[in-house]
UniProtKB/Swiss-Prot annotation:
It comes from Bacillus anthracis. Belongs to the MnmG family. TrmFO subfamily. The lineage of its organism: Bacteria, Bacillati, Bacillota, Bacilli, Bacillales. One of its GO terms (molecular function) is tRNA (uracil(54)-C5)-methyltransferase activity, 5,10-methylenetetrahydrofolate-dependent. It is found in: Cytoplasm. Coiled coil: none annotated. This is Methylenetetrahydrofolate--tRNA-(uracil-5-)-methyltransferase TrmFO. It comes from the Bacteria. Its main location: cytoplasm. The keyword Cytoplasm applies. FAD binds at G10, A11, G12, L13, A14, G15.
Amino acid sequence: MTTQVVNVIGAGLAGSEAAYQIAKRGVQVRLYEMRPVRQTPAHHTDKFAELVCSNSLRANTLTNAVGVIKEEMRLMDSVIIRAADECSVPAGGALAVDRHEFAAKVTEYVKNHPNVTVMNEEITEIPEGPTIIATGPLTSPDLSAQLKELTGEDYFYFYDAAAPIVEKDSIDMNKVYLKSRYDKGEAAYLNCPMTEEEFDRFYEALIAAETVPLKEFEKEIFFEGCMPVEVMASRGRQTLVFGPMKPVGLEDPKTGKTPYAVVQLRQDDAAGTLYNIVGFQTHLKWGPQKEVLQLIPGLENAEIVRYGVMHRNTFINSPNLLRPTYQYKQRDDLFFAGQMTGVEGYVESAASGLLAGINAARLVKGEEPVVLPPVTAMGSMANYITATNAKNFQPMNANFGLFAPLEKKIKKKAERNEAYATRALEMIRNFVNI
């Protein structure tokens, strides 16, 4: 057994999972959690893995990518998924939990492991030696300052401002056209043209749609040069036509005329399966957001794989800074895990902690770190955050659009998703004993 200790900073979903994975591999863990000594604006207890928003860990079926990632984690002995399964409450096809019981169960499993020592103190400097930073979206100001210094100002962010992303296969290609403004460079955007009547209908729905109430600690984010589309719209209908929906230089090749307004979609992944809606960062609730977006010509039946969000979130530019092992490129024994890496969601955060924990344990035991292939859900997330375009990097949920393409194209969505799931679970079984 190695005598080296791994520091894990933060006992949220990612940190708890990482600590457990390290400990079960016979390596000592020093798990730092500043609560209850210092609370965050969103947490209410001193328990590990406290769910601060919904009590749902989303879909539990294999027809959904987040269901596949859960099944992969079950096979890899995830403490988070084990606790969730034990504390589940009825939720149809989703995995929802009794949040208090769930946090208590995770705390018990992790705290009681003989290889885990819990330190209830705030860390303000990045420690020497093997370390996983899993401090989450509400990282304390002192540690944030340290991380900003480590990563560089341009690679450290304090909030999400992400536009919605849709599956290309769900776009009505008969209603959109490929073109760049003024035909500059290659035709890189799908353009959704609107008549004045279509724009008016869209505009009225947008300004009437319900938004997510801002938490007190999130109120500063709109003053940093990134305005939600509904706030722009509230300043007058022409704000959009002269802003993100301006049609100049985007003549419709079918009519030869310039539309009244245009919504542009930009490719979001290397495989060309996902497109983001340019300039549409939003604070709308998800139900109204879907209704509004489906008023855009070509997006009437759009499958939204990530809704637009604007919220407080501390995260790094992982494509520039991390390897798919969750190691920091400039320091082999420093790992990042959780939402800080740009994975979005409870399950995705825990999954990143699982892989970071495994690799930290392997590192101190003198073994090679593991890269999971992108045919797996966990591998596709690690690949996304480290190989996507660094310039437009924004956090992302698990979705089949991130998986490596299937060898054979399958038209029916249900069958295609089943093929992704089957392939992923076959592959992950090769890694269950690492």
